[in-house]
Amino acid sequence: MASFVTEVLAHSGRLEKEDLGARISRLTRRVEEIKGEVCNMISKKYSEFLPSMQSAQGLITQVDKLSEDIDLLKSRIESEVRRDLHVSTGEFTDLKQQLERDSIVLSLLKQLQEFSTAIEEYNCALTEKKYVTGAQRLEEAQKCLKLLKSRKCFDLKILKFLSMELTIQKQNILYHLGEEWQKLIVWKFSPSKDTSSLESYLQTELHLYTEQSHKEEKTPMPPISSVLLAFSVLGELHSKLKSFGQMLLKYILRPLASCPSLHAVIESQPNIVIIRFESIMTNLEYPSPSEVFTKIRLVLEVLQKQLLDLPLDTDLENEKTSTVPLAEMLGDMIWEDLSEYLIKNCLVYSIPTNSSKLQQYEEIIQSTEEFENALKEMRFLKGDTTDLLKYARNINSHFANKKCQDVIVAARNLMTSEIHNTVKIIPDSKINVPELPTPDEDNKLEVQKVSNTQYNEVMNLEPENTLDQHSFSLPTCRISESVKKLMELAYQTLLEATTSSDQCAVQLFYSVRNIFHLFHDVVPTYHKENLQKLPQLAAIHHNNCMYIAHHLLTLGHQFRLRLAPILCDGTATFVDLVPGFRRLGTECFLAQMRAQKGELLERLSSARNFSNMDDEENYSAASKAVRQVLHQLKRLGIVWQDVLPVNIYCKAMGTLLNTAISEVIGKITALEDISTEDGDRLYSLCKTVMDEGPQVFAPLSEESKNKKYQEEVPVYVPKWMPFKELMMMLQASLQEIGDRWADGKGPLAAAFSSSEVKALIRALFQNTERRAAALAKIK
């Protein structure tokens, strides 16, 4: 092979292009022969797995020698071409291009040689457990294969064999690295399937082995460092750390953040550090943020020292050592989940429920800052402020949100509690809240301007006739205990707003308004069935609404000078809600009244129109209907007794009794024929109503106090006097009827129209001259 170059160099003077072409052709054929032999060797080695080490070494020697010859020949050709450009430049250029193609083929053969060498060195390193060296050799082989694939000069089948071999060896080293990782990082768990119990936590352990391994190349490394760097070289470090981080979160950090009694214990033994748990009794329902930060910081400090602060040599050949920020890498993977968990399971429970405790929260903010600074020093966190600290610093907003949420939840619980548990309200009743604070100094002048007027001389402005002190008080009645507590909650919340920041005060104020909006929507829906069926609950609900409306009239006025300035311009009012509550209570009670009226009329419909009372069956039916009506009214009188205010009670009972009496009057006046016996029996039925009707007016539990209202029945029952006149007519003579008519000026004329009186006379008396004369007087 050397003779080729010798002959070329021996020529002096002008190089014959024909002779040069012949020599290049012979050189090209030789390159193709070597290429075939190399490909055959590669195929046998990686496809047929035949031992061919000696043959490969011989081929390598031949390739190197041939490469030197080509370089010398190419240099000589270039000098000849430059010297003899006037002689067939194109032909020499073609020869040069052919020679360059041969050079490319030889360079690819060198890449094959380097690939084979890298695989051999990798196998040796893997046998000696030099994982970093092995990983680096695999990466070198990967680069060689990538270069080979970029050129289209080789058989694709051979490249496929090489790719398969590289994949197998990479999976092989990853398997060995995984086994080493499991030996160095050991998790121990409870055999129980319930991994969230305290007993399960106490059996969880993390073992970190720190034993020194033998030297890898020049620099001694701990096994963990060697394994981590090998993972890094292979591009698998991120996934391995992510898996470790998720387990760290699940089995160590989250339990420490959620369980107040759980504490981390660090045990240092020769070549091993153990992280486990112990339980310390505590009365805390939720963990203190400061304690949680301390416990988590302890665990992360151990991990930083034993695992994440190891020197990882990324360039062993040049002896340049740079520390890979493993702590920062792990922090990026777990911090978002960890901080969110700390907020939801720790910080959120530390938010004060009272504005007076907001100053104490500064300690938690400070401990949060110290916790984050410690993590930044350990490189778990970067320099920016995280969501955890932002959450802690935004305490005013969180306090307001939590307070508003607690208020709404408490209010809804009161609204969905039983209505029938009542308390008695009297005009002197007051809401049980602390005394309101005096207005701020800035507002005192305003108060004086509003309430005090300076006069040059003393004047007596007191009116001669004063109102009763209870003129604007709510009348005595019974309301639901839950509604009384609801109003106390509203007052307490507004009182809290007077000592809170402006933002918080506004939120609390509108939370109180939301309470009443919620009442308007929830109570009629939640208690709908009971309000329709039970008259007592309808009356209580009516009182509840009137009680709330009564307080809403002055609620905003009481606090208007003590709330935030933004609320003191007239927006701090609840008066706009008053009509809605009055309408809500009135509609519910009127619906119950309509239902009771319907029942009364239904019972009276079974009286067979009060006709033919001489028939025993008809009389019995009419008597039963009257008794049922009176019984219903008495029952209502009892269930509404001491519940409704006296005036509402009397109006309601008067309306219902008036409905029954009106129906009876209408039925009797519609009769066309009333015999003497019929008249007597009708009178008897009416006498029963007249005697027992007043007894339904019993608004008070003390019977002696009800006599006054029973004597005032005509005031509440418009048809009471016409009913008495009807009874008189059933027993009176024509003369007595005429006297009570008194030419349209008597009591009978006030109760009935002339046509109604004439109809009754025709029904009661036979057609005689006396009846005709009496009818003639009724005009």
UniProtKB/Swiss-Prot annotation:
Keyword Disulfide bond recorded: no
Region Interaction with ZWINT, annotated ranges: 2-81
Gene that specifies this protein: ZW10
Gene Ontology BP terms: cell division; endoplasmic reticulum to Golgi vesicle-mediated transport; mitotic spindle assembly checkpoint signaling; protein transport
Subcellular location: Cytoplasm; Endoplasmic reticulum membrane; Chromosome, Centromere, Kinetochore; Cytoplasm, Cytoskeleton, Spindle
Cellular component GO terms held in the UniProt record: endoplasmic reticulum membrane; lipid droplet; nucleus; RZZ complex; spindle
Protein name in UniProt: Centromere/kinetochore protein zw10 homolog
Gene3D superfamilies per UniProt: 1.10.357.150
Signal peptide residue numbers: none
Subunit structure of this chain's protein: Interacts with NBAS and KNTC1/ROD; the interactions are mutually exclusive and indicative for its association in two different vesicle tethering complexes. Component of the RZZ complex composed of KNTC1/ROD, ZW10 and ZWILCH. Component of the NRZ complex composed of NBAS, ZW10 and RINT1/TIP20L; NRZ associates with SNAREs STX18, USE1L, BNIP1/SEC20L and SEC22B (the assembly has been described as syntaxin 18 complex). Interacts directly with RINT1/TIP20L bound to BNIP1/SEC20L. Interacts with C19orf25 and ZWINT. Interacts with ZFYVE1.
Region (Interaction with RINT1): 2-317
Main location: cytoplasm
Record function comment: Essential component of the mitotic checkpoint, which prevents cells from prematurely exiting mitosis. Required for the assembly of the dynein-dynactin and MAD1-MAD2 complexes onto kinetochores. Involved in regulation of membrane traffic between the Golgi and the endoplasmic reticulum.
Topology term for the membrane: Peripheral membrane protein
UniProtKB keywords: Acetylation, Cell cycle, Cell division, Centromere, Chromosome, Coiled coil, Cytoplasm, Cytoskeleton, Endoplasmic reticulum, ER-Golgi transport, Kinetochore, Lipid droplet, Membrane, Mitosis, Phosphoprotein, Protein transport, Transport
Annotated InterPro entries: Zw10/DSL1_C_sf (IPR046362), ZW10_C (IPR048343), ZW10_C_2 (IPR055148), Zw10_middle (IPR048344), Zw10_N (IPR009361)
Modified residues (N6-acetyllysine): 777
Lineage: Eukaryota, Metazoa, Chordata, Craniata, Vertebrata
Coiled-coil ranges from the UniProt annotation: 14-130
N-acetylalanine carried by residues: 2
Family indicated by similarity: Belongs to the ZW10 family.
Organism: Pongo abelii (Sumatran orangutan)
Source taxon at top rank: Eukaryota
Phosphoserine modification, residue list: 3, 12
